[in-house]
């Protein structure tokens, strides 16, 4: 009897979850300085969209269709399914038809009968899909199964126009269009959300500090041991098995506010565009930098050498080349101990360095060991 009494009075962790839901609802909205909701920094494992794709035909074009051989083959196959046979060797002259690829993202928990938006893109040499209609196209997933069926009239933002002399103009991209609510979901994607007694939260930006804070925040409100940080990206949380309780539990859980850990110090450089992004935590050790510009200008002109009227010789064109080298005075700026982002920006602006010069300075500081940040060149 004593053992039965102990088991009856013992509270299972999942029972603590159910009893704490009301208290959690009162506490989870407490304001925290610099805090973010869990739903903004993490996703639930297994809750994701899936890509689906298909191949079909767009008809009704105003003479802007393609002339690809696979378009002709696809059209013949479609007509055969309708019981119409096109004689071999006959050119159907498909100026109003274009072969297209159709793709879409199938949102998580999509149910049969729901509508989703689709994107239609020409795969041949069609000039424009404007005014066309997509015929019924099966959209399949990576497993080869059909999850949606697409059909409808295209909305094309781009257009093109041309003249009889061959001149033409194109605005945006007329070979790609959209069909809002253009596909109907026919099959639901299996989800692991309602299985098991745990949920896993995956951080969008893996960070050990953030994972630890999410774990502690959940355990402080629901009870010790319910949340466990698995690694820098994942936090495993015990959750009710019943679907309705699991949904309610997660709706409260995702609105908890947590202060994320500070991002690692990074400097991102786009060498093609000259864009430089400096993170907030970037610091520079004491260092002095001098950077001078050497400008070499080569100009080439042509002069005329014409002899006197009584002298022999021919008038010739003589090239005249001028090489000029200018070196601007080198300017030096110095960083004090633990210089911050503001110090770097202010010093660079005072020197008046171009983006290319800034890249060279940052790379030199990194090589010298004075730049305490990860330098990423994209």
Curated annotation (Swiss-Prot):
Major localization listed first in the record, in broad terms: periplasm
Subcellular compartments: Periplasm; Bacterial flagellum basal body
Keywords attached to this entry: Bacterial flagellum, Periplasm, Signal
GO cellular component terms listed in the entry, alphabetical order: bacterial-type flagellum basal body, distal rod, P ring; outer membrane-bounded periplasmic space
Signal peptide: 1-33
Gene Ontology biological process terms, A to Z: bacterial-type flagellum-dependent cell motility
InterPro entries: Flag_FlgI
Gene Ontology molecular function, alphabetical: structural molecule activity
Quaternary structure annotation from Swiss-Prot or TrEMBL: The basal body constitutes a major portion of the flagellar organelle and consists of four rings (L,P,S, and M) mounted on a central rod.
Role played: Assembles around the rod to form the L-ring and probably protects the motor/basal body from shearing forces during rotation.
Similarity-based family: Belongs to the FlgI family.
Name listed for the protein in its UniProt record: Flagellar P-ring protein 2
Organism: Hahella chejuensis (strain KCTC 2396)
Gene from which the chain derives: flgI2
């Amino acid at each position: 009897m004593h053992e039965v009494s102990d088991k009856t009075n013992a509270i299972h962790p999942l029972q603590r979850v159910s009893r704490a839901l009301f208290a959690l609802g009162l506490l989870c909205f407490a304001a925290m300085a610099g805090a973010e909701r869990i739903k903004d920094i993490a996703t639930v494992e297994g809750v994701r969209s899936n890509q689906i794709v298909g191949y079909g035909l767009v008809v009704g074009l105003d003479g802007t269709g393609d002339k690809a051989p696979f378009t002709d083959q696809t059209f013949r196959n479609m007509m055969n399914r309708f019981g119409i046979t096109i004689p071999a060797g006959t050119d159907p002259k498909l100026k109003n038809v274009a072969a297209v690829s159709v793709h879409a993202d199938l949102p998580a928990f999509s149910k049969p009968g729901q509508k989703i938006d689709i994107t239609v893109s020409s795969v041949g040499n069609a000039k424009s899909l404007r005014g066309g209609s997509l015929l019924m196209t099966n959209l399949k997933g990576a497993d080869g199964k059909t999850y949606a069926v697409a059909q409808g009239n295209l909305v094309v933002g781009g257009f093109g126009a041309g003249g009889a002399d061959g001149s033409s103009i194109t605005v945006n991209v007329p070979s790609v269009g959209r069909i809002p609510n253009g596909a109907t979901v026919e099959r639901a994607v299996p989800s692991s959300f309602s299985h098991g007694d745990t949920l896993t939260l995956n951080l969008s930006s893996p960070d050990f500090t953030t994972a630890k804070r999410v774990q502690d925040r959940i355990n402080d409100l629901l009870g010790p041991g319910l949340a466990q940080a698995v690694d820098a990206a994942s936090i495993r949380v015990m959750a009710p098995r019943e679907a309705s309780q699991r949904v309610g539990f997660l709706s409260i859980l995702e609105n908890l506010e947590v202060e994320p850990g500070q991002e690692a110090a990074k400097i991102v450089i786009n060498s093609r565009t000259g864009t430089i992004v400096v993170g907030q935590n970037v610091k520079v050790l004491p260092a002095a930098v001098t950077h001078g510009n050497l400008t070499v200008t080569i100009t080439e002109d042509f002069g005329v050498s014409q002899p006197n009227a009584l002298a022999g010789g021919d008038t010739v064109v003589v090239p005249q080349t001028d090489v000029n080298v200018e070196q601007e005075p080198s300017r030096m700026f110095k960083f004090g101990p633990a210089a911050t982002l503001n110090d770097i920006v202010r010093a660079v602006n005072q020197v008046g360095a171009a983006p290319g010069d800034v890249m060279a300075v940052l790379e030199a500081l990194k090589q010298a060991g004075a730049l305490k940040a990860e330098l990423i060149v994209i």
